[in-house]
Amino acid sequence: PLLDPIVGSLITFFTLLGYRFMVVDKDKRYLRKAFSSYISPNLVKQIVEDPKTLTLGGRRQECTFLFTDISGFTTMVEANHPDVLTPLLNEYIDGMIEIVFEHGGTLDKIVGDALVVMFSAPIEMADHAERGVRCAARMDAFADAYSEAQKAKGIAFGHTRVGVNTGMAVV
């Protein structure tokens, strides 16, 4: 007789816990999944904790943009078989994106070998310009080391050009 209320309470607890997981936390899981490939885990956490930080319709604010491009990429594509080039490019881009996320950047897009990165969107950052420049310096160092490592293997991997610009944008 004493176990009946305890068992009933446990069943209620686990039912409510299951409901929360299935219904209430569903939105948080969706946000994590939607943004995890584009922005750093810390920014994803902020968005999940306060989804109101995202506004639809766009707003005008100062942002820093970073652009990368591998010089001679077309020649590199023509000179190497896709089985050789694809893993190299994936490894290179993964390394570059890791650096972007370390600096709190948002990956806007990847076009072939080029990356476009934003700082201060979707969440505003007071130090976005500094983050962009520091990120660019780290990416440049990574890209130079990566290119040298590939050259040592006999693969001509082009030099990465990195550009940074700060200005007003609608985000």
Q: Residue ranges of each PLM-predicted region?
A:
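Transmembrane alpha-helices and their extracellular/periplasmic helix-loop junctions
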Residues: P1-Y38
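Alpha-helical scaffold segments in soluble metabolic enzymes
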Residues: L17, L43-Q46, R138
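Juxtacatalytic helix/coil linker segments
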Residues: V24-V111, K151-A156
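Catalytic core of nucleotidyl cyclases, primarily class III adenylyl/guanylyl cyclases
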Residues: I99-R131, A145-V171
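Glycine- and acidic
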Residues: L17, V77-N80, S120-A121
